[in-house]
Amino acid sequence: MRALLIVDVQNDFCEGGSLAVEGGATTAAAISEYLTVEGATYAHVVASRDYHIDPGSHFSARPDFSRSWPRHCVAGSSGAEFHPDFDTSAVDALFSKGAHEAAYSAFEGTDDTGAPLGAWLRDHGVDELDVVGIATDYCVRASALDAAKLGFVTRVLLGLTVGVDPRTTREALDEMRAAGVELAGRPLLEDHDEDVVTQPE
């Protein structure tokens, strides 16, 4: 059974947010359109969100944008909410991550019963996973790598992701490909880089 994992399509990761990725809003809308057309082909649709309460050194007034970041996706804030262009009506389960520490992979998240994503997927008979969301080179990358490591047949639909930077996106694509993740399409980047080449759609 195949499921769709939608990673961190939140206000703070889209234009106007505290850790915005250019193209985030476009990606949110594209995912909603994809769900309208293809959502019924998935046994389950799940989503993750950053949901920070007190993540310690993950937040910094002087972030290095590698290990520390500006405040973002604080639990209960508007920045932690899903972007309004992302229609969540098809989402079966929501997994929150990063409450008290840094968390990039959706597989570090749990649902409102405390069930981790990997266990939830297995319990629901899922063995294949498509991954989309924000950002290609950070949380999408981490989620796809964990999915493959856990034995899920994993595919990233790059046309429904957006990368922060061409260099780190290229590195993420290479790493995912080396881990056996199937890459379909091309990620959205603010400055399109023709060197970011993946399998054609």
Each model region followed by its residue ranges:
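Charged helix-capping and loop-helix junction motifs
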Residues: G24, T110-A115, R170-L173
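Structural recognition of alpha->loop->beta junctions
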Residues: R71, G79-A93, R167-E201
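Acidic/histidine-rich helix-loop elements
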Residues: C14-G23
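Histidine-anchored nucleotide/phosphate-binding helix
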Residues: Y34-L35, Y138-K149
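Active-site alpha/beta core segments
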Residues: A29-E128
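Extreme N-terminal starter segment of soluble prokaryotic enzymes
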Residues: M1-L4
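A short glycine-rich beta-strand->turn/loop micro-motif centered on a GG-aromatic cluster
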Residues: D130-G133, V153-P166
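Short, glycine/acidic-enriched loop or turn micro-motifs at the edges of active sites
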Residues: N11, I53, V162
